[in-house]
Curated annotation (Swiss-Prot):
This is Large ribosomal subunit protein uL29. GO terms for cellular component: cytosolic large ribosomal subunit. Keywords: Ribonucleoprotein, Ribosomal protein. InterPro entries: Ribosomal_protein_uL29, Ribosomal_uL29, Ribosomal_uL29_CS, Ribosomal_uL29_sf. GO terms for biological process: translation. PANTHER family: 60S RIBOSOMAL PROTEIN L35/50S RIBOSOMAL PROTEIN L29 (PTHR10916), LARGE RIBOSOMAL SUBUNIT PROTEIN UL29C (PTHR10916:SF0). Disulfide bonds: none annotated. One of its GO terms (molecular function) is structural constituent of ribosome. Pfam families: Ribosomal_L29. The keyword Manganese does not apply. The keyword Ribosomal protein applies.
Amino acid sequence: MKARELKELRSSNPQDLTLKLGDLKAELFNLRFQLATGQLENPMRIREVKKSIAQIKTILREDEMRALEQ
């Protein structure tokens, strides 16, 4: 993700982030299935999706910690 996309994610509400996280997890499942069957065209997409999942989880955790501090 680019810096601009990360800023957009940070300004999103947790419900939207959770929905996006679910979509990315489903996409990762499909990519892994395609990899196992030999149909995956772009193996780098798996890395990109995993990185996006980690970034969204980090943003959700930051929001959670910020809420606990207040």
